[in-house]
């Protein structure tokens, strides 16, 4: 999945339209928007929370029939519900099952300390669904108008020891679920579901087995989630039909297992979420070994999560091959193996992004047992920065000031200085918006900082014009910029799994606190 010339041309077209018309913070994950620069481009990774795991098996119903502990989202879902002002988690637990798992619910006021409420679905437990599943995706669908379908559960259920199918359920509260409303054909295991608001489609990321590439992904989309599930079925060896398309496989330069370097990487899972102006993709890269070898060695398979981004929801830029959510090299750690992503990532908590993951302890007797839930944290927008050292540098972006574009904001960590100059379409500084006119950002670390000039507190006078924004940095990192309709700096972009103080509509707009929207 490298950037080929045709794809690059397509992305250039998309991004030119995007920067001109898109609302949302503009992230430096996207190099196609850069006209000129002499800055260094730096990829960043989250830091695991020191209090991990934030959730693990401590209830008898979280053990399977063999007594093995399970308490983590297998996709599952971790979301912030702005209406109820709490973090919500749907995770997989043993449930006394033999083949698969059941779905449990937990909640939190801060995203770090989780409680398992006693509910009435299976009295005396926090179990909310008893279908014996391989994996499950739970969506808190903030774009759904029907309140009875606000929560959606895509359950990959075991039919028997060898086959699985997907069922779709709805809920108004995330606790009490409907009977299945749609049923797929036979599938491979480890599928995932999500919503793409740019395409206005629900998406299934379907596992397939493709020759030399082995574990790979197929793509299925539909605006109706019931049709989506009903159309899903297993397809072999890089084949497609009218609705299902072959999507992608692992790259040769994806990370490999240090003890098994001869094993070619594979895609174990993939899911995605809208964040600001793009789709953020999570690629769980399998590095081996196979389950039989794991059993014989009493170890976990090595899965690590890498990230990518997309402007069209189908073609992915995966330039960074550094694990974003890695395993720990500590044999006894909660994430010693098999780290996988969770539906709802990222959540926006103040100046940070929260990423929840499932991780596995090395354990006996089963290679896939004993899993728990961890948290990793990253600066908001902090995937990639443009960095200047002691020598001043710049990055120049061509854009159009939108009709509602009143205020320019940046997300930057400035130990020295940052200034912005606005140039016309011919590359000449616009009077009143020169570097000298700019009010410097000095020795300040802000994820939302308004930029102004001595005679221009905003960019309202430039609305509708095509301009170049030249950011001058010295001893500074810039992570994002955006042009907001509001003096309070909301971007109009998508907010992932949500967060405290945000609008409950899934979009970064000013919140009417009386309505919790």
Predicted regions and their residues:
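Sec-dependent N-terminal signal peptides
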Residues: 4-15
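Beta-rich carbohydrate-recognition and catalytic domains
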Residues: 21-268, 273-336, 350, 356-516
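Extracellular glycan/ECM-engagement signal in secreted proteins
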Residues: 340-343
């Amino acid at each position: 999945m490298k950037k080929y010339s045709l794809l690059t041309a397509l992305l250039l077209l998309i991004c030119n339209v995007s920067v001109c018309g898109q609302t949302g913070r503009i992230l430096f994950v996207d190099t196609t928007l850069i006209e000129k620069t002499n800055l260094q481009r730096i990829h960043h990774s989250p830091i695991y929370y020191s209090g991990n795991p934030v959730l693990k098996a401590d209830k008898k119903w979280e053990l399977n029939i063999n007594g093995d502990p399970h308490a983590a989202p297998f996709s599952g879902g971790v979301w912030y519900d702005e209406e109820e002002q709490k973090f919500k988690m749907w995770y997989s637990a043993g449930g006394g099952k033999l083949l698969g798992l059941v779905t449990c619910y937990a909640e939190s006021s801060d995203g770090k300390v989780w409680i398992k409420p006693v509910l009435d679905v299976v009295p005396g437990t926090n179990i909310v669904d008893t279908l014996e599943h391989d994996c499950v995706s739970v969506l808190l669908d903030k774009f759904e108008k029907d309140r009875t379908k606000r929560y959606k559960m895509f359950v990959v259920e075991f039919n028997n020891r060898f086959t699985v199918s997907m069922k779709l359920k709805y809920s108004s509260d995330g606790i009490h679920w409907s009977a299945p409303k749609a049923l797929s054909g036979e599938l491979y295991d480890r599928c995932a579901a999500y919503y793409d608001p740019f395409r206005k489609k629900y998406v299934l990321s379907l596992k397939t087995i493709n020759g030399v590439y082995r574990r790979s992904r197929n793509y299925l989309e539909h605006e109706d989630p019931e049709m989506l599930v009903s159309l899903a079925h297993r397809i072999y060896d890089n084949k497609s039909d009218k609705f299902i398309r072959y999507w992608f496989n692992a790259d040769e330069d994806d990370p490999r297992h240090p003890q098994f370097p001869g094993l070619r990487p594979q895609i174990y899972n993939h899911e995605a979420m809208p964040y600001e102006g793009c789709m953020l993709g999570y690629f769980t890269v399998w590095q081996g070994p196979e389950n039989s070898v794991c059993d014989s060695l009493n170890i976990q398979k090595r899965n690590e999560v890498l990230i990518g981004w997309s402007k069209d929801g189908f073609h992915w830029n995966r330039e960074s091959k550094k694990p974003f959510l890695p395993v720990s090299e500590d044999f006894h750690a909660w994430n010693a193996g098999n780290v996988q992503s969770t539906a709802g990532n990222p959540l926006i908590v103040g100046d940070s992004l929260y990423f929840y993951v499932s991780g596995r302890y090395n354990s006996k007797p089963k290679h896939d047992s004993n899993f728990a839930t961890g948290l990793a944290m990253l600066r908001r927008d902090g995937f990639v920065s443009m960095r200047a050292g002691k020598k001043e540098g710049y990055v120049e972006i061509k854009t159009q000031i939108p009709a509602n574009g009143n205020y320019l904001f940046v997300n930057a960590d400035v130990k020295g200085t940052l200034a912005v100059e606005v140039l016309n379409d011919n590359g000449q500084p616009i009077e009143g918006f020169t570097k000298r006119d700019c009010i410097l950002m000095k020795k300040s670390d802000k994820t939302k900082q308004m930029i102004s000039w001595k005679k221009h507190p905003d960019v309202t006078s430039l609305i509708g014009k095509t301009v170049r924004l030249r950011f001058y940095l010295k001893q500074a990192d810039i992570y994002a910029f955006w042009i907001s309709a509001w003096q309070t700096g909301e971007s109009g972009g998508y907010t992932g799994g949500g967060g405290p103080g945000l609008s409950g509509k899934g979009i970064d707009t000013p919140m009417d606190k009386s309505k919790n929207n």
